[in-house]
Amino acid sequence: MAKLDLSLSPAELQSFLSARRTIRLATATPTGLPHVVPLWFVWVDDTVFMNSTLGNVTTRNLERNPSATGSIDDGDAYEELRGVLIHGEVERAVDDPRLETVKSEWSQKYMGGKPPPYDRWKNRVWLRFVPRRITSWDFRKIPEAKAKAARDAEATGA
């Protein structure tokens, strides 16, 4: 049987990444071990924006090696699982022209529209995660994908 296409369409990907709240970001320690942390994020212009504490393990790892992988998923039962795996580089977003939009969307998503407590955030840094490769899956599509594969096989006589 041919491989089933369970990937998210571009519209589904945009919707999924806009709705999800947490990315699990994996960076590499100096010895090469994975360091995985959950972070809140916003998806703006095909880029993941998040913030973290300056000088923590995550930001130190990224200063040494900006390569990272992020996992965003949803669902509990196997047939409900869906998600996105992003591979790319993470960098500080200090001069990014989209930062005001990012802050506004972040505030709406996580603070109910209130501005973040910047007076307590003096040691926070905004990060930009630029995807190099995105993989997605939606196991809710399995029944239809199997039915399509069967129809295709029947049509080709395979």
Where are these predicted regions, by residue range?
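Charged, gly/pro-rich active-site loop segments
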Residues: 1-8, 78-158
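Short, basic/aromatic recognition patches
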Residues: 2-24
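Amphipathic alpha-helical interface surfaces
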Residues: 13, 58, 64, 98-102, ...
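Short secondary-structure boundary/capping segments
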Residues: 14-15, 40, 60, 76, ...
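Short beta-strand segments
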Residues: 20-54, 62, 70-73
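A short local loop/turn or secondary-structure capping micro-motif enriched for an aromatic residue
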Residues: 44-45, 57-60, 79, 145-146
